[in-house]
Amino acid sequence: METAVILPPEFWHDGSVWIAEPEPSVESRALAVFARDELRVQDWCFFQTSGTEGARKWVGLTKQALLTSARAVNEHFGITAEDHWLLALPTHHVGGFGILARAHLSGSQVTQLAGKWNASAFVQKCAEVGTTVASLVPTQVFDLVAAKLRAPESMRSVLVGGGALNRELEAAALHLGWPIHCTYGMTETASGIAAQRLPGADMEVLPIWEVSADTEGVLSVRGEALAQGYAICTAGVWRWDAISANTGLRTRDRVEVLEVEGHSYIRFLGRQSGSVKILGELVALGPIQDQIESLKLGLGLHAADAAVCDVADLRKESSLVLAVSGMNSADASRLQKSLNETLRPFEHIHETRMLHAIPRSELGKVMLAELRALL
């Protein structure tokens, strides 16, 4: 069953503070008190960061920041009252909640896909309600491609964010008719920073943002939709870590920033925290994980899961391990062999470990800190 979703117009200026989570908790109630009594703020929303490493933080965004981001996305993709969203992301994540902000400004309809994510149910509902636009994460795109599900004729744009989409998966989705537009953003930027205007193109920086990369390629971003800061709770005590509007946010992402005919473009290279040293060489885990996802498709391992992770190595500083779940030892060996054929010699994986499940976030990101603990 699906439900129509809409926020009352007064939500955006009623002075309330909204805590984004699936169910109320002791922590969120304490955060609401902290926001009211200590921060003394109104018309703010708090979202937990969806990153794969580090301490849990609540990102404080003004409702105006969310609307500013939504307006920029609507303009970039030409979203109007004629469009119909199918909401397949949780609204307690900024990627899902941002859809409600875009719909509020554009007047477009929103239908929420009920129940646990299911690729076939998603396609069926798209066809039933005449969906024209949707936002997905790479794992959902993988499921659509693995099941060889074609896009309904009504679909004109599928915004893919929450993680990098590898080129092979993008090409396979486009071949099935899915009008994929890769996007790049984070909770701290109220969702989008950059997005493809056309499938397969570089991601164009939205005009509300100023971006730069330092000598190490680490991205800094500044703009009017930037978060105010982080609420952090340690041992029951809340503190506030502000983000400077003047200097902006130095992210942990490595990018290439391109300037072409007065427009800025971003190419995502990987997470700064997702790089390890092996025999003195810097190795980015993100591209290796992308290769794993591509190989799973090619080897027909659609129902299985796998992830690369670093472990301490006395001689090499770090070494790589392939963690797998839902596959037998023969399939794991095939995957390991195929993966090693794509890697540099010092990156080669010599050990595979079977797990009950690969720890992933609600949006499908591999949780590296939790995975390391299991290994």
For each predicted feature, which ranges?
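AMP-binding/adenylate-forming catalytic domain of the ANL superfamily
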Residues: 343-366
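AMP-binding/adenylate-forming
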Residues: 61-71, 84-143, 181
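AMP-binding/adenylate-forming catalytic core of the ANL superfamily
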Residues: 246-347
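Conserved pre-ATP/AMP-binding loop-to-beta segment of ANL
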Residues: 29-48, 81-84
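Gly/Ser/Thr-rich phosphate-binding loop
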Residues: 146-200
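Active-site loops of AMP-binding adenylate-forming
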Residues: 186-204, 224-228, 232-237
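Conserved ATP/PPi-binding loop(s) of AMP-dependent carboxylate-activating enzymes
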Residues: 215-251, 271, 281-283, 287
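Conserved AMP-binding A3 loop
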Residues: 44-71, 78
